[in-house]
Amino acid sequence: MALSPVQDPPSHTDKTMPRRAFRRSCDRCHAQKIKCIGSEGAVARASCQRCQQAGLRCVYSERCPKRKLPKPNPAESSPASSTAGLHTSSSDSSPPVPSDGLPLDLPGPDSSGVSLQFLDPSADCDWPWSSIGVDETVVNNCLDLSHGHGHGDLSCQLELPMPDLPSPFEFSAEKSPSPSVSGSIAGAVSAQRELFDGLSTVSQELEAILLAVAVEWPKQEIWTYPIGTFFNASRRLLVYLQQQSNTRSDQGMLNECLRTKNLFMAVHCYMLIVKIFTSLSELLLSQIRHSQAGQLTPLEGHQFEPPPSSSRDRSSVDTMPIFNPNLHIGGLFSYLNPFMHALSSACTTLRVGVQLLRENESALGIPPAQGVAASVSMGKEEWADGEDVASAVTTADEDLRQPASRILSMVWSDEVGDQKAKSADAAGPRSRTLAVLRRCNREIFSLARQHNLAS
């Protein structure tokens, strides 16, 4: 029999401790259930090849002797002890706790061998129960830790895998039922959103027109301006404003918020119309001045130049211009008198523009004294030069009852009752806008009266 390299504690001697048999394989190979290749002939077993390759200390533990349970005496058994017998039989199904009488070699301070034979359900140990259900991975981890650190105390805790229990914080969130919305409220909200989409479209069109008036239109001749796009956008705004005024205002808080948003968008569109009309008035006046000075060419830029002739008599055909094949009857006047054609077109444009502007102000609820259309002089010189254009704006409370009027008062820098702006240069946006519109209208219609065009 080979001796274990593990030294016995000093308190035991060869006389008190009987010789015991050791395992044929080391603890590591036995726990992993692999073949242990070591030296069996030597008294002190050498380290096996696997432990040497792993760099671990090779330990051979002793075999636990077979435990013989004492047979109970049938004569001593009584019916009173049947309950104890049932308890004993039920307790045999669980592994016994090692006591002082069970021969277990706990490692001393100078050794690192750990005897875990009572955890091994293999055939080397003849236990009356089949298995204790200990995971082999846990045992291997304990052995590797004890061998690697060289400690003698058993510090590894055997933790069995815990079952997957449902977390107390995980719960299925049930969707709360959405509050029921009446059909009338839902219809009102849908109508307000559709109205906002329409106003947004008009706003984008007006912004594009304002850019074209400032950049593209000055490069063209006055009778080629696409004025229909501006008038149609102004008319669509008027339709949306009338649609907004027909909707009810007592349809809930959300409907009120949507109405306020639409009102801000409508005021923005109105401001764009005012700016476009102001820029267009300046452009019309500039083109009329050029036409009056003889610098404006007829339609399509074809100015007729009679061919040189030595004859004194010229035919009327020689003095007629070359007409464009696509010429309409409405543009025929531009060939005969370009200046009068430009002046007549400008007067018509201003009349239609002021009329659409006045109707939009009425649909928005803007009082005439605060609007722009009523402050523009159409054919009459009602305002003297340098007169304060903001003086006609009244401060009465009834003029500021409409929400659009209050919003417009905040937008214009010279609000109601402002008497500090005495000139167009020192005034705010509203004063400058009114000054430009009044000046352009006064000069254009003054020329029209001189040529008997203004009624």
Swiss-Prot record:
The keyword DNA-binding applies. The lineage of its organism: Eukaryota, Fungi, Dikarya, Ascomycota, Pezizomycotina. The gene is mokH. PROSITE patterns: ZN2_CY6_FUNGAL_1 (PS00463), ZN2_CY6_FUNGAL_2 (PS50048). InterPro entries: Zn2-C6_fun-type_DNA-bd_sf (IPR036864), Zn2Cys6_DnaBD (IPR001138). Monacoline K acts as an inhibitor of HMG-CoA reductase involved in cholesterogenesis. Its hypocholesterolemic activity might be useful for lowering cholesterol levels in the blood and reduce artherosclerosis and coronary heart disease. This is Transcription factor mokH. Residues 1-22, 68-113, 296-317 are annotated as: Disordered. GO terms for molecular function: DNA binding; DNA-binding transcription factor activity, RNA polymerase II-specific; zinc ion binding.
